[in-house]
Amino acid sequence: MKTPERNLVRRRLGRGGFTLTELLVAMACVGLVLAGLTGLFVSGQQSFLVGANQVEAQENVRIALQRMADEIRGAGNGPSGAAFTAIAAGQTATSLVLQNDWNGNGIIEPGVTTNVNGMLRGEQVTYSFVGTQLMRQESGVDAAAVPLIGGVQGLTFTYLGADGATTAVTANIRSVTVAVRGGPQTRTPSNPCAPYTYAEGNVGVAMIDTARIRNR
């Protein structure tokens, strides 16, 4: 039979040890703490990703919308009375061709470039929505369509007449409403045809603007 003195010696020498129950309880407590910390880390990472993607998406959509609106407003530039439309025939809900008679000869020549304020300009500019990219091509300047922004989830052109009603007649178009929806272009979702999941930084920025064609 062990005496109290011998038990005291064992404790002083660090040979008391732990019971299996104590060890399991300690491991369970550590596991709970680690699970909580992991949850906080994942949540913080997702929140940061959403915020960063939101900023990027807003900037991309804003730049693209402003660029298109500016060029739509300036379309139709040319000598007074020239018989050409500011937007070429065949416009659709996701593409349009803007026209300007930069050399002033009264006709639109897609293969001709003109020096305008020190910059070569083509007489047609095409905007189109392909896949997840907004494409722009300037005739005589760009050999092929150039991506303006990526991460585009939707693009819609709506054509309006002088009375503000929608029109499909090219010669009657006086304004164009442009609606763009996009996400970040530096990352792509696991399924490009579906919206981002929250874990991927789910964002979707939508902007809309109506541009009045000043030369018509």
Would you name each region that the model predicts?
Residues 57, 61, 127, 171:
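Aromatic-acidic/polar surface patches that form glycan- and anion
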Residues 2, 6-8, 102-104, 141-216:
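Short linear sequence signals and composition-biased patches located at protein termini or domain-edge surfaces
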